[in-house]
Amino acid sequence: MAIIEQVGAREILDSRGNPTVEVEVALEDGTLTRAAVPSGASTGEHEAVELRDGDAERYGGKGVEKAVEAVLDEIGPELAGVDAIEQRVVDQKLVDLDGTPDKSRLGANAILGVSLAVAKAAAESVGLELFRYVGGPNAHVLPVPMMNILNGGAHADTGVDVQEFMIAPIGADSFSEAVRWGAETYHSLKSVLKAKGLATGLGDEGGFAPDLPSNREALDLIASAIEKAGYKLGRDIVLALDVAATEFYRDGAYHFEGSKRSAEQMAGYYGELLDAYPLVSIEDPLSEDDWDGWVRLTSEIGERVQLVGDDLFVTNPERLEEGISRRAGNALLVKVNQIGTLSETLDAVHLATSCGYKSMMSHRSGETEDTTIADLAVATGCGQIKTGAPARSERVAKYNQLLRIEETLGDAARYAGELAFPRFTPEA
């Protein structure tokens, strides 16, 4: 047994200089582990709720002392004496103790920190790496790194509407090779931008954030960078988008590239992009509550491209069930802090997989050095992870952890590669 002796918490900073929660769990056998909680810039309306202090005199109201107190005063005493191996028991206690549907009383940031720290403690106590503890003996698939190398939308102060332009090195033979290809393309993009006299400042997630006239211009620049780095666009490296359409949906219309567009017009735009570029994945192409638009879009282009629900599903099994029943989207974005416990996160991935939906593990724009999602990507075998550009330590930490896992697995390691995107046929 791995009995929980004490649960502690503190306020730390995330990668954007905002406070977040870090939780420590101590077991009776001497095990001590910690987990830090991420935070998003573009957050879905239906996400579990972070508890912030609201005191304008501290951190502009974004302090998390209340969440820390919730861990110390309520959650810690409740979990003392509980076996950390019983993850579902722990997570159910957290949900019951909070007592709200959106975890707003204790805060999803407090609850998630505890849930993840408990899992880490249990894994360490039994002598297993986290990916092996959560995923079992057969966890061996390394995900395709979806590297966000050009930022727009809420992640950058520019005229580019699409929030993330990603590259996916599907033609690599291993995860380590994929990381190298991505890093080389990232540096190539910097030189392409410099040659055109464009800014090379970075967005929240480490991608470049030049002010460009259109979203297509961003795709063209990335295509040039891929070729300049010596790789074949559409065979070695393909493209993906996070549109984050909820961010520019107002009054029943999409305010996109200087005009108001309907869901049908957005669908036509995406169809044109698919004809022009090797796109394998489009995340949040429509607003989080535009169910009818999502259904039509999935019917029109869902056989050609992965359509990922982030704000639409918010890693919530109930929202995902509704999407599956309506045939809206065909993939789930997995953000542990959207739902707030490890058990519920794993339930969402299992539901997606069992219904033929793909899953993509994801960071948030406000990250820490915590690498839990890297282990979860391998544990779930989801085959895809997005955790920013190959730059900024809070992003690179996840890639480095995956490199370690690949090394640990040795000959058993398998890189997901093009199999992660069954709707896409690579060029010869």
UniProtKB/Swiss-Prot annotation:
CDD domains linked to this entry: enolase
MF terms (GO), sorted A to Z: magnesium ion binding; phosphopyruvate hydratase activity
Annotated metabolic or biological route of this protein: Carbohydrate degradation; glycolysis; pyruvate from D-glyceraldehyde 3-phosphate: step 4/5
Highest taxon in the source lineage: Bacteria
Subcellular location: Cytoplasm; Secreted; Cell surface
Cofactor: record remark: Binds a second Mg(2+) ion via substrate during catalysis.
BP GO annotations: glycolytic process
EC numbers: 4.2.1.11
Enzyme class: lyase
Cofactors, names only: Mg(2+)
Record Gene3D superfamilies: Enolase-like C-terminal domain (3.20.20.120), Enolase-like, N-terminal domain (3.30.390.10)
Mitochondrion listed as a keyword: no
UniProt binding sites for Mg(2+): 242, 283, 310
Principal place of residence: cytoplasm
A Pfam family: Enolase_N
InterPro entries according to UniProt: Enolase, Enolase-like_C_sf, Enolase-like_N, Enolase_C, Enolase_CS, Enolase_N
Active site: 205, 335
Disulfide bridge positions per record: none
Keyword Heme attached: no
Similarity remark: Belongs to the enolase family.
PANTHER family to which the protein is assigned, alphabetical: ENOLASE
Function as written in the Swiss-Prot or TrEMBL entry: Catalyzes the reversible conversion of 2-phosphoglycerate (2-PG) into phosphoenolpyruvate (PEP). It is essential for the degradation of carbohydrates via glycolysis.
Protein name in the entry: Enolase
UniProt source species: Saccharopolyspora erythraea (strain ATCC 11635 / DSM 40517 / JCM 4748 / NBRC 13426 / NCIMB 8594 / NRRL 2338)
UniProt lineage: Bacteria, Bacillati, Actinomycetota, Actinomycetes, Pseudonocardiales
